[in-house]
Amino acid sequence: MAKEHICIIYGGKSAEHDVSLLTAQSVINAMDKDKYAIDTIYITNDGEWLKGPEISETIEDSERLRLSHIERLSISEMLNVSSAGKAYDAVFPLLHGPNGEDGTIQGLFEVLDIPYVGNGVLAASTSMDKLVMKQLFATRGLPQLPYVSFLKSEYEAHKDNIISLVEGKLTYPVFVKPANLGSSVGISKCTDSETLIHGIEEALQFDRKLVIEQGVNAREVEVAVLGNDTPETTLPGEVVKDVDFYDYKSKYKDGKVRLQIPADISEEIQSALRDMAVEAFKATDCSGLVRADFFLTEDDKIYINETNAMPGFTKFSMYPLLWENMGKSYSELITDLINLAKERYKDKKNIKYKMD
């Protein structure tokens, strides 16, 4: 049987560039090499696109995927024809953060009419923007913690007023977050005015729009969602931390976080979380995959935190492990996502774009 031609796109002009390399290594190694011919495209930190070789062997070190300058091709040439001279059956973007999971590259795939894994333009962009995401969750009646948002220009013009607004609406501790980054990049836990100002100024290095959320003493539980119009969910898992909060360093470097799968919670709460995860998936018109993150308090109150349209996706990340607990292997999950991409593309092809 002829192999399907899949293009893995990784790297990206983002603070989460190195995370993307780890993800690409993990996915490439897990893909069924008898079923798929795997091409690669590396996007440098400066935004340059480099066409990599077809890969059929195991990648032992993610640094091998950090390509140097090679033959220059146009982006459309890279995306439209595989190394074997055939059109791709699907592209698989493994990009985190701005320019990768925020709808921009998804728009490129749409314009070039290429099947791609994961969420579409609308879902990717709204899931990346924490403020827009919260506004959409509100339309579905999903419970959320109080928050304040503002722009860099507003903070620079009215710093004292912004601080007063935060302290008037929220109580310490609070969490300062760039609106458009993932992997906990730029997030700070703030316990007083001094740390709040420092946290704001740190976060503004990564984004022009910030969200400041009420801190809460709660467990962090997550549900994986997979599908298109009729998504399936997993049992919830829990992020168990040996640190004050789950930042970039504890996620990827220190090993101070462990995942409990499934989470030790009642069947009633499990069911409620899974239902809310589907509501969140639908609120942002998602497809393919999403990880829905929640806070669960001691008195069993549930608050949705966010949806992640391109969740951590190494073999040891929460999303694949949640599915492994449900009996779906990492390799099978990748195959399912590719098939969902082709299914969605086929459905779009049946849409009329002109009147008879």
Curated annotation (Swiss-Prot):
Domain ATP-grasp, chain residue ranges per copy: 134-339
Known function: Cell wall formation.
Cofactor note: Binds 2 magnesium or manganese ions per subunit.
GO cellular component: cytosol
Family designation: Belongs to the D-alanine--D-alanine ligase family.
Keyword Cytoplasm annotated: yes
InterPro entries linked to this entry: ATP-grasp, ATP_grasp_subdomain_1, D-Ala_lig_Van_CS, D_ala_D_ala, Dala_Dala_lig_C, Dala_Dala_lig_N, PreATP-grasp_dom_sf
Binding site for ATP: 167-222
Reaction equations catalysed: 2 D-alanine + ATP = D-alanyl-D-alanine + ADP + phosphate + H(+)
Protein name per its UniProtKB record: D-alanine--D-alanine ligase
Subcellular location: Cytoplasm
